[in-house]
Amino acid sequence: MIIDTTEIETINSFSKLESLKEVYGIIWMLFPILTLVLGITIGVLVIVWLEREISAGIQQRIGPEYAGPLGILQALADGTKLLLKENLIPSTGDTRLFSIGPSIAVISIFLSYSVIPFGDHLVLADLSIGVFFWIAISSIAPVGLLMSGYGSNNKYSFLGGLRAAAQSISYEIPLALCVLSISLRVIRLSNSLSTVDIVEAQSKYGFWGWNLWRQPIGFIVFLISSLAECERLPFDLPEAEEELVAGYQTEYSGIKFGLFYIASYLNLLVSSLFVTVLYLGGWNLSIPYIFVPELFGINKRGKVFGTLIGIFITLAKTYLFLFIPIATRWTLPRLRMDQLLNLGWKFLLPISLGNLLLTTSSQLLSL
């Protein structure tokens, strides 16, 4: 049987095209993920620089100024130093738990960014249960901290891990109830818990349509609970230096210690982004009764300009809000453990339940 050479060449060209399609498909799938990871990394570096500059201003001292212009590269210098340090492992600890703990903490927080809309439908995964996906994923991070504390075989580390788990449980419930209070109205309008739908529900009435004005009590409870979830002062009991040396981080060094450092700022950034999405109107400019398309002529200039404006507005709101947790770290004293638990269970939980009851009643009366 004789096969024409042209037929063989045609078959080979088709096979090459199919393989190229598969390669381009993989690249097209990975490109948004890599872009998001790169953006998050740059965002964390900016937060570290902002915190150092703001803390220097509060304490009336000079902040970082030698590593790059205005000290902007100081975080990169610190990261390089941690990469070059020796990675020590306790000889009497559980090596597996000790090594897995930091990775669980970082990966769980990274997954939370997948449901955050940075612009009009500019979201990696627009899930119908987006906000509760974030709550479910964020509850995994304390498990990694507890594993790190237990695997270190150190009493200070173990106490720090236990404190992290207790603190997360205490403040996760009020935070979830505040999110549920916001979601009730969105469910009635669009039958969805998508973060995109939550932002669009706030865009109909401009500045006064923000959930900040509809849910002022929930906003305050959410703010306090998110600070506790981020383990920021005055809620940094799991790693209190005067009591526990460094808490669950005591036995860590090198890149694993750096992962905890990154995780704390990743958690701070994702909490501020969710405050922007849930309470501050997301990517909408929210000048009263003037929306972004009318103000900037986005419909005339194309979708790219509108997307860039949406990203800029979201990040501007986020970084303006970040001043609150950064300032509280350097101005408020640390709570005791009993005060922290009493605040969560005896005050924030009843207040969030009452807020949910009021929201439910108002929704039923408006039907």
UniProtKB/Swiss-Prot annotation:
GO MF terms held by the record: oxidoreductase activity, acting on NAD(P)H, quinone or similar compound as acceptor; quinone binding
Classification via InterPro entries: NADH_UbQ_OxRdtase_su1/FPO, NADH_UbQ_OxRdtase_su1_CS
Entry GO CC: chloroplast thylakoid membrane
Reactions the enzyme catalyzes: a plastoquinone + NADH + (n+1) H(+)(in) = a plastoquinol + NAD(+) + n H(+)(out); a plastoquinone + NADPH + (n+1) H(+)(in) = a plastoquinol + NADP(+) + n H(+)(out)
Annotated compartments: Plastid, Chloroplast thylakoid membrane
Entry membrane topology: Multi-pass membrane protein
Transmembrane segments: 30-50, 98-118, 127-147, 164-184, 273-293, 304-324, 340-360
Top-level taxon: Eukaryota
The protein's Enzyme Commission number: 7.1.1.-
Keyword list, A-Z: Chloroplast, Membrane, NAD, NADP, Plastid, Plastoquinone, Quinone, Thylakoid, Translocase, Transmembrane, Transmembrane helix
Family listed: Belongs to the complex I subunit 1 family.
PANTHER family: NADH DEHYDROGENASE SUBUNIT 1, NADH-UBIQUINONE OXIDOREDUCTASE CHAIN 1
Functional summary from the UniProt entry: NDH shuttles electrons from NAD(P)H:plastoquinone, via FMN and iron-sulfur (Fe-S) centers, to quinones in the photosynthetic chain and possibly in a chloroplast respiratory chain. The immediate electron acceptor for the enzyme in this species is believed to be plastoquinone. Couples the redox reaction to proton translocation, and thus conserves the redox energy in a proton gradient.
Assembly behavior: NDH is composed of at least 16 different subunits, 5 of which are encoded in the nucleus.
NCBIfam families: PRK06076.1-2
Protein name per the record: NAD(P)H-quinone oxidoreductase subunit 1, chloroplastic
Species in which this protein is naturally found: Nicotiana tabacum
